[in-house]
Amino acid sequence: MISVIIPTYKEPEALNLCLQSCIEGQVNKNQIIVVVDGFYDLNKEVLEKWAEYIDVLNLEQNVGLCRGTNLGVYNAQHDKILIVNDDNVFPLNWDIHLETDYIENSLLTPNQIEPYPSIFNQFHIKDLGRSIDTFDLKCFQEYEKTLNEIIYKKTPEETGSTLPIFMSKMDYLKVGGWDENYELGMVADWDFFLKCHLSGLKMLRTYNCHFYHFVSLSTTTPEKLTYRQQSEQNGHEYAKYKWGSYIKHNPQNNLKSL
């Protein structure tokens, strides 16, 4: 069994689709933890709709993505955890694929389908919808199944280090989880992947399971985009302060280094 951690903020429509795909796509009855990082009333209708299938961790106030994710992991009942953003869509049989491809002492990343070109050359680029309103879940599920058959790979590749994250809860705790000092969580993922790599975990990617990612649904205005860009720059500066140098990204295998 898997404990799924889904932090959510102010995107109830995205959360609804995320939960629908997660619940309908699973083979086993996994623990699904929705971490409500403030704005419970905004998400209340969606949470009540899926109440039978989920555990709700209501933080009552906005504590930030990193702390919210850490608290979600602390509440995981199973050793295997899957951390997923609420703007992701789960494919069919996602739990079986992940458990089959996972090996000990690793962090396994399911590949992603995105509608825009990405800096991660492993991602599959296909516009199946850039908003919740234009997305067809059944169409995605059928496309993803066909895609898996075309690019099926027997063993994962060492090109992980992107979200979503599938790993052992104990390994997550050993490396200290997300660093809660990163503004908006920007660059915290690079920091986390760096810690995992330095701790000896293999950073793996499976192409037998693709999640859809809408990419920055909440960044809808020039002001929000500017704020996000500034937060990212602040994140890189904090990483330099913490580690003594900026975190470097290898575009070939996505490994993070100093």
Q: Positions of the model-derived regions?
A:
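Short, well-formed alpha-helical segments that are part of the catalytic scaffolds
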Residues: 11-24
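Acidic donor-binding segment of Leloir-type glycosyltransferases
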Residues: 22-58
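Glycine-rich, basic loop-to-helix element that forms the pyrophosphate-binding segment
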Residues: 59-76
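A recurrent flexible, glycine/aromatic-enriched loop bordering the glycosyltransferase active site
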Residues: 66, 144-169
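Short aromatic/hydrophobic "clamp" motif used to bind/position activated sugar donors
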Residues: 81
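Conserved donor NDP-sugar-binding/catalytic core segment of glycosyltransferases
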Residues: 92-134
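A short, conserved alpha-helix in the catalytic core of glycosyltransferases
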Residues: 98, 159-167, 171-176, 183-210
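Active-site donor/metal-binding and catalytic loop motifs
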Residues: 115, 183, 205-224
